[in-house]
Amino acid sequence: MTKLNEKEIELLRNGSSGSIATVLAKAVPGLSDSSRTITDYGQTLRGRNALILVDGVPMNLTRDTARGLSAIDPESIANIEVIRGSNAIYGGGAAGGIISITTKAAGGAPTAKTVVGLQTPLTNFRSDALSGDIHQYFTGSLNNLDYALDFGYQRIGSPYDASGHRVAPEPAQGDLFDANAYGIGGKIGYHIDDNQYLQFAANYYNAEQNSEYASDPNTKKYSAGTVPAKAIRGLKLKDQNKNENQIYNLTYNHKDLLGNKIDAQIYYRDFFTRFSPFDARANANRGKQVDQIYQENNVLGSRLTVTTPLEFLGDTSLVWGGDFSREKSKMPLDIFDPKVYDQSGGLEFVKIGNLIYLPELTTQSLGGFVQLKHRFNDQWSAEAGTRYEDSYAQIDSFVPLSQLGKTNPYTVSGGKVKADAWLYNANLTFSPTDQHSIYTSFNQGFQLPDVGVILRNAGNGFNLGSSFLEPVKVNNYELGWKGSFNNFSSSLAVFHSTSDLGAVQSFGNGLVLARTKEKVTGLEATLDYLDDANIWGTGGSITWMKGREKPQNSSNEQDMTGFRIPPLKLTAYISYNPTETWTNRLEATYFGSEDYRLNGVNSFGRYDVKSYTTADLITSFALNHNDTVTIGLENIFNRKYYPLYSQLMRSSDNTSHLLANGLTVKMSYSHKW
């Protein structure tokens, strides 16, 4: 488990261009590198998708948008907890683990805080490269009432690489270069009595791009990976990349209801996202159009967790409860005049109509769980539990875009796809001393596949009984050790996970879909040191994993793609805190080389990836009790490199071959009123 508090997050963001996804990639063992764009596609945890929670509300969707980490204002985050490995207690896609984000809390002494930030590349001083933000927070209590309010604005400029060239937009999954972002959130809590607490929270975040730049399509004529993506000016597109996220969350807590601790939650989420336009005229599944997809989702859910002490069994407790989620998704697309598009060299988009790529899809999940925890003595403890989950996906009959223009179009018959499963978990921990513990665990995870990506690419003869719609069930085995000695703390974990059917893989924009039998084996280790005076500290981590898959109707295994299994990752840092008011951190991250090709042939997610190292320097100084200045230098050695996502080229050509940011400075000033 990795925990980051508010102070650590604020510090690390200044060395990562403000990106939460990049902060986590540098700080969390087992997590792949970030894309440096709007998407967290390919940023797997232990080779599988992670469940992202914001105040307990899932950001994952059945029709996966891979935009969970960019759908919340980073300034509103108070702490992050990452649990690695599949989890039988949570449903909804926790196959690789859980990234749990908590926003700033209500209550306490009345406080107001203003934060102003400024960011610019140091390789090219231009007004369009300048980013800035301002945020305001209010928290406090009034009698039995707690409150919190935060709001802010951010202007996101354009990044520049180590040579001073503008980094091109990412056309496959999108980006938020040249964007405006607004966020507002609030919490109102009421102490009913000493044991009961009721809170309502609302959060709204809107980030929308407004750029004049596109990724030059002329780079496609060169062999993939041989030239960087190039930004060209002249884009004429009214509606660009966008994330709009609304969360409404009602929670109730009771510390002692007939001896039980109760945590209940009801939430509603409304999410809209828009992608970059795409020339899909060679793709029959999308109707052979120049198009732009957007997606609308709303989710209603609830969760109840009850903790019951079983004192008659000694130091024992029972955690039990259930959860419910109902999601509705639809995916329209706009179509553009192909002649105008061609005449402009792929820069001008004139809308001429719209179509439905994926009609309204309803998915529902109902789960119940029970977990028994028991401590035998000071050295031995164990827990075991089970979860039952019942899910379905439902859609009405529809004619897919693959049938557009055909004389006798095929209609996909509507209906329900049902799935249910019993999941189990067990954990045994031995602590020979207070400083050391050894554990072994078994956990199962469960999720529906990406039903939307299957249905929207349906062709002749497709039926809802397809094996592509069977659920993903993951078995995760882990053996680990945690310890501390003198001024050192360390951890070591070895894990192995298997699934008979992995997630649905889409190749060539849905022209080819595949599911494989998967197994992932890996190792994670950390080592940290802090001197007696709490002045000097150092540490690092190592992550290594290997993924193998066996395609359906094949007896041969092959390596999994780089979008699933990252190369060797090493992290290291040195901290120097000479006073209580001055903090300094130098950090470095290394990703190794890995050849993901099969028989030396490039294909989706399969390229010969080169190693890269990046380093950041961050310093934070408290001028007084109320004022703090933080300065971060990202990529301090101004290394020219391609992140993993860019080397794997999501678009399968050079338009996604984006260089990383060059030397960039981010400064922030905060004042408490």
Name the predicted role of every residue range:
Residues A21-P58, A78:
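Extracytoplasmic beta-strand/coil segments of soluble accessory domains associated
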Residues V57-R84, Q136:
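Short acidic/polar hinge/loop motifs at secondary-structure boundaries
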Residues I72-K113, K672:
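A beta-strand signature from Gram-negative outer-membrane beta-barrel systems
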Residues V115, D378, S391, N487-Q505, ...:
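Gram-negative outer-membrane beta-barrel transporters
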Residues R126-G157, D161, H165-E212, E244-K255, ...:
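Transmembrane beta-barrel wall of Gram-negative outer-membrane proteins
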Residues T251-N253, K261-D279, T429-S431, S437-N443, ...:
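Membrane-embedded beta-barrel scaffold of Gram-negative outer-membrane proteins
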Residues F446, F495, Y590-N599, S620-W673:
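C-terminal beta-signal and adjacent terminal beta-strands/loops
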